[in-house]
Amino acid sequence: MVLKTIEDNCKSQFDDDLVEDFNNFQTTSSMSSSTTISTEDFNTIEIESTFEICRSGSYTEEPILGENDEFLIDFEMERFLKFLKDKTKQVEKRKEPFSQKEIYAVFQRRIKSELCIETVKKKFQPLLPNAIQTCEFDEETMIRMIYGAGIRIDSVDFWNRFTSKATISLDCYSRLISYSSDSLTLSGTHRSGFTYHWISTPPVTYHRTENKDPNIQEPSPVEFLDVQSSLGSSMKPPILDKPTKLDDPAETRHDCSYSLEEYDSQSRMPRTDAKKSNHKHKYCYEMNSNPRGTVLILSNENFKNMERRVGTKQDEVNLTKLFQKLQYTVICKRNLEAESMLEAIKEFAEMAHTDSIILFLLSHGDGAGSVFGIDDMPVNVMEVSTYLAYHQNLLLKPKWVAVSACRGGKLNMGVPVDGLPALEDKCAPISKFWNLMMSRIMPGTFTSLNADVIISFSTTDGFTSYRDEEAGTWYIKSMCKVFNKHSKTMHLLDILTETGRNVVTKYENVQGNVVLKQAPEILSRLTKQWHFSRSM
């Protein structure tokens, strides 16, 4: 019997209230009286938390449900519904808000089995809006309640229901969208060769909102360029002073002002005419601020122990000219140590009040996803993107992190490259500093969705990135060329994909019979199209 199992195994931790609750539930439920819970199953429950709940009637943040214990889930749901009903009767008499541990904790159960997840969602989803509305939770608790159990809500319906009766800011709503069933919260796609595949990055399964307007077109899949190198890992790099090009002698120009005639008119990439497209469409980011956005360029040339990055100044010039032309404010900071780079990024995020932001990281890099300060200390690119994604000033705004650096130790000894053969274990002080920064804007523990962020790399993971000492890097030079040609007719993903095509097909190092190539890569979490012409 259930009661006997509890009494035999947990006498020291449970009081008469728990036994009475189990007894009442078993009597009123449709479950057979012969149902038992084995000692092994019952031990999966965190007894202390369950005891506290039953004794005080106050829900804690600790999980109390065991894996695959459907009976215990039903029992807990029954208690919770009764608890909520009793509490809501006291709303008018109670002046202060309910404790954040009340009700919220049930939504944050760390349940592993699909059965448990579906049961929780089925029981709680209809209850969630009323619980939030009635109990007047603060915004942070509201977000955690929805995120904790992986419950998807219709964000539009949520906004309409609660703006009139509950205090909720736009910032809070924008974070809720990240965890809602809104179809704009795309998990992204993966490109393997020329085949596109959906990938799932959120902590719960991607879900499309039901009963959507059939006339609304789904956003097109995000392109992820992943071109494999044709060279084997044992291939010796040639000795070559400067990169050469397959065609177009005019490519030797070192500025980013390119004419129509100089551009490859036979490009096979699809064009998206920004003038003809509907910029009021929900799948285009707003670009109406003046200035249109802010660009921060962190450019490191002189390092403590690594090779000097000759040519990075030309990248700075090309990028500054380009984005000033696109009506962006450009800030360039040179030769920073790793901690100073993080401080600069923090200041950049806090001062950004435009419709979009762009961060360029021009430095040496490694295969661990980091770029280096001039003190040879690493800054993790993914942590930077996470910081920007969750910053209050940047919610719902498109954010682009562009990295021009090596991503591995496959070095070309004859061509200057942005890389480091090996990374020593020097990152602890920087990680500590970074965690402190993150804790100030990300209370609690969340799995990052990196919504509205796109990261572009100059090369594929594991390979080097090439740089001309006079003209700058292949990647930045090609990117500026494509932007000057197509910034009014392409959105950002098309521009970056065309940039990748140019680098792959038009640049190479040749020494005898050996050909070295470079393939840029894109990782996108954008939820809309990013155009660089003003919204109409």
UniProtKB/Swiss-Prot annotation:
The keyword Protease applies. Isoform a: Expression is restricted to the late germline pachytene stage of meiosis I in both L4 larvae and adult hermaphrodite gonads. Isoform b: Expression is restricted to the late germline pachytene stage of meiosis I in both L4 larvae and adult hermaphrodite gonads. It catalyses: Strict requirement for an Asp residue at position P1 and has a preferred cleavage sequence of Tyr-Val-Ala-Asp-|-. Pfam families: Peptidase_C14 (PF00656), SPK (PF04435). Residues 1-273 form a propeptide. It comes from the Eukaryota. Keywords: Apoptosis, Hydrolase, Protease, Thiol protease, Zymogen. One of its GO terms (cellular component) is germ cell nucleus. One of its GO terms (biological process) is positive regulation of neuron apoptotic process. Disulfide bonds: none annotated. Disruption phenotype: Survival of touch neurons and several pharyngeal cells is not affected during development and no extra pharyngeal cells caused by impaired apoptosis are produced. Basal and ionizing radiation-induced germline apoptosis are normal. In a ced-3 n2427 mutant background, more animals have the M4 sister cell that survives. In a csp-3 n4872, csp-2 n4871 and ced-3 n3692 mutant background where the canonical apoptotic pathway is impaired, 16 percent of animals have still 1 or more cell corpses that are morphologically apoptotic and are internalized by engulfing cells. One of its GO terms (molecular function) is cysteine-type endopeptidase activity. Autocatalytic cleavage removes the propeptide and generates the two active subunits p16 and p14 in vitro. Cannot be cleaved by ced-3 in vitro. PANTHER family: CASPASE 14, APOPTOSIS-RELATED CYSTEINE PEPTIDASE, MUCOSA ASSOCIATED LYMPHOID TISSUE LYMPHOMA TRANSLOCATION PROTEIN 1/PARACASPASE. Heterodimer formed by the tight association of the large subunit p16 and the small subunit p14. Cysteine protease which, in vitro, cleaves itself and caspase ced-3 into their mature active forms. Also cleaves, in vitro, inactive caspase csp-2 isoform b. Required maternally to induce apoptosis in a subset of cells fated to die during embryogenesis, mostly independently of the ced-9, ced-4 and ced-3 canonical apoptosis pathway. Involved in the degeneration of dopaminergic CEP neurons in response to high Mn(2+) levels. Belongs to the peptidase C14A family. This is Caspase A.
